[in-house]
């Protein structure tokens, strides 16, 4: 029995072993293992291709098994692997992944989803050896973790495996983005030094900037509330530029997700920033569709920022549906033809006016809203959703006397040092995404900090979720000061960012 490896995407990336057996019986080719219609159609396509290229089709009963058999497989990129298993019965097939659709003339073609699959593979397996269509080999060779071999047609594929002259078909091109990596605790990171949007452009708003530093380091969720023009959106749009550097696997996964949404995605060190409009549909934000599960904004924001401007103007159902991805850090999408789970680890940033007219906090303009209108406006955001917000910032109007202070470069440098500090204690997750069972290990309180927190629990009647949020924010504040334990000062600052009715 011969084997080659291929890849498919169901609930995530699946490594598929393509196996072949040849037995006595009526000449026939059958494919088993939950193969899609596109794969089953390849039977006739492969037969026609072999005959047109003057290859003799074996006079045996051939069974192709796609293992594991319990996972649905789809895509015409299985063609090449199946054809090679038929033609190379006596050859040793090394540990290669093989992907590519066959044309009737023997040419090896790419498919729409192939580059996305390669990105997911590179994020999952290091130094995978893969045979791809020559048309995408140059682009694929820029993906780290892959040894890429590009083949143009079936004859080249036969030569490749028979003669084993692998280097003749090797494509190697290092993307300039991956030069000068930063190594932290045996892991490779790539630091962004391009501050296209800079915090020094924002005058005043020191508390909002402090909240942005805390949120950027720990990937916490923020709600900015303030009058129009107070700088809420400006703060949100600048946050991705100061977040900790991405690891190589994070960049690959970000681009893999982006490639599901757009064919022309580019590698970047800057984390994802998604900014859906308040009129967006539920399907566009959370993913879905009619038959196939299309990726949505919450998954595309993975590893970066999801920004909801004019938060109360979003549909109530959309706001309530945020609870799952914010709490579980993943989203499940089920449709007729597919069921997919995406990671949703992002910093959620919401911005809203304090009232429908926006002037409640204004010192210069009068608010024209009634008490009931303000109450209705506020109640559009439910208590369970507010409970998932880590940092609340009330922003005053900008004054002409306000000065610019810290720049994005300075903020980024402080966050990097705090990030390295957190990595050295063996922490792999962002503070804001720590599991509750990890809090006792990483969030060690000094005695006066514990007393202060106990007092806050009784005074504010804190829920368990709120308590854990305060601990996580305090951990980020302590990291910015490179403090091993959480002190009373850190707890008090975290409490100062709590939203109160």
Show which residues each predicted segment covers.
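Hydrophobic anchor at the beta1->P-loop junction of P-loop NTPases
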Residues: 224, 308, 351
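Conserved alpha-helical scaffold flanking the Walker A/P-loop in AAA+ ATPase domains
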Residues: 213, 267, 272, 280-306
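Walker B catalytic acidic pair
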Residues: 303, 309-310, 321
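Basic, amphipathic alpha-helical bundle interface domains used for macromolecular binding and assembly
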Residues: 32-43, 58, 65-75, 315-501
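Walker A/P-loop
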Residues: 217, 222-265, 328
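The Walker A (P-loop) glycine that initiates the GxxxxGKT/S ATP-binding motif of P-loop NTPases
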Residues: 226, 287, 310
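Peripheral, non-AAA+ core regions of ATP-driven protein-machinery
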Residues: 1-223, 227-230, 484-488, 492, ...
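P-loop NTPase switch/communication element
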Residues: 242-287, 347-349, 355
């Amino acid at each position: 029995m011969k084997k080659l490896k291929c890849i498919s995407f169901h609930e995530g990336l699946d490594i598929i072993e393509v196996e072949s057996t040849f037995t006595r019986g009526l000449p026939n080719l059958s494919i088993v293992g939950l193969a899609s219609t596109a794969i089953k159609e390849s039977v006739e396509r492969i037969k026609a291709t072999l005959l047109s290229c003057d290859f003799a089709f074996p006079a045996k009963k051939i069974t192709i098994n796609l293992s594991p058999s319990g996972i649905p497989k789809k895509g015409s990129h299985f063609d090449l692997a199946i054809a090679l298993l038929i033609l190379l019965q006596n050859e040793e097939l090394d540990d290669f992944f093989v992907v590519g659709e066959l044309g009737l003339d023997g040419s090896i073609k790419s498919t729409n989803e192939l580059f996305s699959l390669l990105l997911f593979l590179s994020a999952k397996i290091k130094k995978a050896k893969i045979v791809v269509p020559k048309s995408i080999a140059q682009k694929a060779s820029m993906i780290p973790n892959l040894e890429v071999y590009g083949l143009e047609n079936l004859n080249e594929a036969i030569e490749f495996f028979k003669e084993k002259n692998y280097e003749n078909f090797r494509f190697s091109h290092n993307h300039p983005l991956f030069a000068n990596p930063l190594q932290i605790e045996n892991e490779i990171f790539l630091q962004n030094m391009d501050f296209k949007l800079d915090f020094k452009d924002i005058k005043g708003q020191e508390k909002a900037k402090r909240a942005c530093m805390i949120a950027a380091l720990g990937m916490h969720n923020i709600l900015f509330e303030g009058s129009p023009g107070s700088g809420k959106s400006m703060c949100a749009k600048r946050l991705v530029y100061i977040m900790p550097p991405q690891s190589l696997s994070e960049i690959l996964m970000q681009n893999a997700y982006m490639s599901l949404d757009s064919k022309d995605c580019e590698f970047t060190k800057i984390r994802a920033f998604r900014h859906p409009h308040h009129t967006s549909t539920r399907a566009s934000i959370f993913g879905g569709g009619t038959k196939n599960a299309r990726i949505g904004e919450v998954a595309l924001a993975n590893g970066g920022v999801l920004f909801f401007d004019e938060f109360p103007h979003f549909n109530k159902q959309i706001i309530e549906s945020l609870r799952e991805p914010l709490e579980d850090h993943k989203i499940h999408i089920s449709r007729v033809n597919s069921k997919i789970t995406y990671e949703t680890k992002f910093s959620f940033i919401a911005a809203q006016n304090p009232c429908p007219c926006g002037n409640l906090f204004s010192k210069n303009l009068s608010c024209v809203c009634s008490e009931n209108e303000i109450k209705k406006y506020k109640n559009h955001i439910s208590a369970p959703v507010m409970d998932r917000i880590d940092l609340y910032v009330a922003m005053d109007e900008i004054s002409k006397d306000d000065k610019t202070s810290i720049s994005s470069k300075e903020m980024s440098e402080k966050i990097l040092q705090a990030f390295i500090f957190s990595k050295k204690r063996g922490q792999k997750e962002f503070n804001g995404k720590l599991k509750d069972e990890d809090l006792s290990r990483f969030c060690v309180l000094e005695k006066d900090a514990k007393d202060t927190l106990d007092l806050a629990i009784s005074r504010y009647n804190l829920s368990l979720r709120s308590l854990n949020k305060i601990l996580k924010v305090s951990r980020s504040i302590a990291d910015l000061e490179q403090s091993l334990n959480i002190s009373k000062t850190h707890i008090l600052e975290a409490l100062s960012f709590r939203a109160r009715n």
